[in-house]
From Swiss-Prot:
Cited function: Catalyzes the isomerization of sedoheptulose 7-phosphate in D-glycero-D-manno-heptose 7-phosphate.
Enzyme Commission no: 5.3.1.28
Location relative to the cell: Cytoplasm
Protein name: Phosphoheptose isomerase
Keywords tagged on the record: Carbohydrate metabolism, Cytoplasm, Isomerase, Metal-binding, Zinc
Catalytic activity: 2 D-sedoheptulose 7-phosphate = D-glycero-alpha-D-manno-heptose 7-phosphate + D-glycero-beta-D-manno-heptose 7-phosphate
Primary location class: cytoplasm
GO biological process, one term: carbohydrate metabolic process
Domain SIS: 36-197
Family annotation (Pfam families): SIS_2 (PF13580)
Binding site for Zn(2+): H60, E64, Q174, H182
GO cellular component, one term: cytoplasm
Source species of the chain: Bordetella avium (strain 197N)
Originating gene: gmhA
Length: 197
């Protein structure tokens, strides 16, 4: 395959997955918007976490909440749990990497808050433990996964939302994850500021 054809195949694969994801995830995505909006309307907070590219997605999502998405509005209460290197290194050193998010959820999370947990495999132990801590603290969880959902998919309760991308390739899952996070931001803004579309 020549390089142009190889590059073209990325667009074709992404478009096909966008269509599949639209069919599978539009309804639960709308439910996730309602969950986030309800938490914010009740003075709750949104915590987000992930590893690697998913950590970057968590940070990106929270930046859109605290800053703005496309329209000016008041800042929204969001915390990316992967951004404080002192906490991450202290907890990682003293308790182990698997606890870096769990301890923060236990410290910061309150009943009615929402944890946005991101893992392309659904099996990241530290994100799984964050979900378990969120459940113990009577928080809601929005899990962004792929590859069938893994352990995180098994932890989802009727009070949570699972956004599982129907694909096994990590980069394609990550591409849909950022689309989902942007859609969540748009939905929150539509409920806060009115629908402009």
């Amino acid at each position: 395959m020549d390089m142009t054809s190889r590059m073209t195949s990325h667009f074709r694969d992404a478009m096909a997955l966008c269509e599949q994801s639209m069919q599978a995830l539009s309804e639960p995505l709308a439910g996730a918007v309602e969950l986030l909006f309800a938490a914010l309307a009740n003075n709750g907070r949104i915590l987000a976490c992930g590893n690697g590219g998913s950590a970057a997605d968590a940070q990106h999502f929270v930046a859109e909440l605290v800053g703005r998405f496309e329209r000016d509005r008041l800042p929204l209460a969001g915390i990316a749990l992967n951004t404080d290197t002192s906490i991450l290194t202290a907890v990682g050193n003293d308790y182990g990497f698997d606890e870096i998010y769990e301890r923060q959820v236990n410290a910061l999370g309150q009943p009615g808050d929402v944890l946005v947990a991101i893992s392309t495999s659904g099996n990241s132990p530290n994100v799984v433990r964050a979900m378990e801590a969120a459940r113990d603290r009577e928080m809601h969880v929005i899990a962004l996964t792929g590859k069938g959902g893994g352990v995180m998919g098994e932890l989802i309760t009727p009070h949570d939302v699972h956004l599982c991308v129907p694909h096994d390739r990590t980069m394609r899952i990550q591409e849909i994850h950022i689309l989902l996070l942007h859609a969540l931001c748009d939905g929150i803004d539509a409920l806060l500021l009115g629908d402009t579309e």
